Amino acid sequence: MDKTKALDAALSQIERSFGKGSIMRLGQKEQVVEIETVPTGSLSLDIALGIGGLPKGRIVEIYGPESSGKTTLALHAIAEAQKGGGICAFIDAEHALDPIYARKLGVDLENLFISQPDTGEQALEITETLVRSGAVDVLVVDSVAALTPRAEIDGEMGDALPGLQARLMSKALRKLTASIFRSNCMVIFINQIRMKIGVMFGSPETTTGGNALKFYASVRLDIRRIGSIKDRDMIVGNQTRVKVVKNKLAPPFKQVEFDIIYGEGISKLGELIDLGVKVGIVEKSGSWFSYNSQRLGQGRENAKQFLREHAEIAAEIETALRQNAGLIAIELLENAGSENTEGDEVI
């Protein structure tokens, strides 16, 4: 039997059974589209992700220790999506969202939908309904660890219910994945870290909610606080490191560092200076920073203040950095070295 005729017959049968478009050639011109992205609020992280930001129509996981900047990063993504006219929602399972801080990061509270569900099932049902609507561009679930199953809430404190949350997440993600892709909605799950008992070799760290999220996520970001930023004796922010642990859309394992300033969020000006020095756009001589023979200031903080007062020079540096994104990405990959986080498994 001729293979071409057999294939045509099979394709016709599939289309009769499941509708036109249920199977197609991947290279058909009208079907191939670029993946839409949402900027993260961090220029270096956008470059490290390889596609200019976080992908729409995919699941993203942001995890790390307490007070490392997980929610801050998610709120920056919401603010960037809103700037582009997107509709965003925030499922606050932890009941801990600070609207004043969110506004300072640039979030438009008037157009942000928020839900504070009582149970994990309720949170995931609301998530599914919003995703299926096709009207939401970015949806954040904060956090997976706070998605408490109804059986656990109704039970006694001492009840042992092993694997209940993992089963809940596994079922929810099976249902959500196709809807997320069809609606082109990005769902960001914020997750916490736990320690595995009795681990002799490798990292004892793991994330909550079982393994399903590791499989379904297209991008996984490990965010850590690596130091403090001081203004004289007062701590005014955190030095933060983000590692792209998994990336289905570009090479993973790139690592970036940026500042998170209390009450302001990610310091864009600090990134412009750091990345500029790496690529050679900003010159550093001793403690002095300069750009195109124009002195920016002595010391990093003075250089940041100069860029704050001269927005046109900051815009010039940002444009030059975006034009050198490929070079920066290679450097970020080299800087990541061979450090492993949670085995760096790409699942």
From Swiss-Prot:
Phylogenetic placement of the source organism: Bacteria, Pseudomonadati, Pseudomonadota, Alphaproteobacteria, Hyphomicrobiales
Family label: Belongs to the RecA family.
Cellular localisation: Cytoplasm
InterPro entries per UniProt: AAA+_ATPase, DNA_recomb/repair_RecA, DNA_recomb/repair_RecA_CS, P-loop_NTPase, RecA-like_C, RecA-like_N, RecA_ATP-bd, RecA_C_sf
Protein name: Protein RecA
Gene Ontology cellular component list: cytosol
Organism: Bartonella tribocorum (strain CIP 105476 / IBS 506)
Record-level Gene Ontology MF annotations: ATP binding; ATP hydrolysis activity; ATP-dependent DNA damage sensor activity; damaged DNA binding; single-stranded DNA binding
Annotated GO biological process: DNA recombination; DNA repair; SOS response
Function: Can catalyze the hydrolysis of ATP in the presence of single-stranded DNA, the ATP-dependent uptake of single-stranded DNA by duplex DNA, and the ATP-dependent hybridization of homologous single-stranded DNAs. It interacts with LexA causing its activation and leading to its autocatalytic cleavage.
SUPFAM superfamilies according to UniProt: P-loop containing nucleoside triphosphate hydrolases, RecA protein, C-terminal domain
Residues that coordinate or bind ATP: 64-71
Key words, A-Z: ATP-binding, Cytoplasm, DNA damage, DNA recombination, DNA repair, DNA-binding, Nucleotide-binding, SOS response
